[in-house]
Amino acid sequence: MNTFELLIFQPLYNFLALLSGLTKGNLGWAVLILAAIIRLIIWPWYKKAMGDQRKMAKLQPRIKEIQKKLKEEPIKANQEIMKIFKEEKINPGNSFFFIFFQMAIFISLFIFFKQAIGNDWSPYLYSFIKLPEQINYLFLGFINLKAPSLILAIVSASLNSFLTFIQPSSGQNKVMLLGFPFIILFFYQKFPAVIILYWVGFTLINILQEYMINKHTQEENQTISMKTTD
């Protein structure tokens, strides 16, 4: 067992085996629970990244004004913009790092699921973890998690498109966010359905978190507006 398998694969095998036991061997529900747990773990980072995105969206008029005023001096313009970011405690790289981090997780899980599907898990299991007698690879009675699923690919692309439009991302970020699910849609035949199911669960929790952030932001704006009026 190499270092990658020891640090990434073995914990995933054991955690998924534990979740599969809780779901009576249903791998589909175990994967959805795994997606929810991972999403909750990275929630603080996501919240910070989205907070920076909202601040940057509000600062766009000032940024455009600086760019217009100093269009002949791009270096100075960038310095002024970075000064604003520093004053507002904004890290413009947070959202990019978060996207790449999500992709790194997805790629790791892609490799993991490709190996785990249909293979023997016992060599990777800790002594205190028991695998269910039978793993059910049929989700909702008709989706074979071992094979590609056009239905799940369409659901994934649709959910991610919706998420992209409700997030306060810049144009470049939106292209990255919108492009990834459609890559899955176009190349879904290369992905076992279990991977797409994970991404569907991950995105559903993401949408819920985005709703919570939007609601909190609206309440803050209303409070500020009321104080200003008074």
Regions found by a protein language model. Give the residues of each.
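Helix-loop-helix
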Residues: 1-230
